[in-house]
Amino acid sequence: DPEEQAGQEKPVREKTPFSLIGNLIFLFTIAILAAISWLIYSSWSPQNTADLPGFRQKENAPDIPKILKQAINRDASVSFSEEDINRYLASSVHPQQHGALAIFATNPAVGIRLHGGKEQPDGAIGEGCMEIIIERYTGIDSRQTISLFLTPFQSMDPHNYMAVQTRFEFYNDETLPGGIHVGGTIGSLSVPQGYMIFLLPAFENLLQAYLPLIHMIEESGMGIPISEGRLNLTPPQKRTL
């Protein structure tokens, strides 16, 4: 009967409920994938070394150990530019790749950037630091860089009235979210200080090669203020009774 059919309720199509949790999970997954992609891209995007003075240039390299020794003997100050140090490194160090990547990595080189201290939120100027950079090529023309920050700190030795203690910390004066110090870089990606333990093996042989020079500076007690682009070594302060 048509009247009975009209009186019957029409079937209601069941609606799919809006899933807030499902959409949040989807967006969270997309965000994680985007973050991973960015990390991979940044780690394989090398920092620019074309603007690094003296990098890979052996010509006219200064004899830094000799110049430093003369300054110590004369109780005089001496200053080296990035170009001076990088030419010296290019002429004196011959880095080699070891391990699993040895058959892929070629033409490694070492350079240094000198960063002056930056102004902190409280108005104080942070310590200057040096950035040791290792550059190598993998494959046909794929350039890769890693770097390690070294910040020098000096204080008077409480056990030896005439001595100065020098130590180096593996970070610069920049911080990541949470106040974590930046210890170095992989490509253009800043790496927290705590993760530098994974990069230290790449720098150990390099640091060992220059231990005599490092010890000469430490034993002399010379100050090591670092300004933008320059390493300044100053005679130790005379302590009076």
Feature roles, as predicted:
Residues 7-241:
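Extracellular/lumenal and peripheral-membrane lipid-interaction modules
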Residues 1-6:
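N-terminal targeting leaders characterized by basic, low-complexity, disordered sequences
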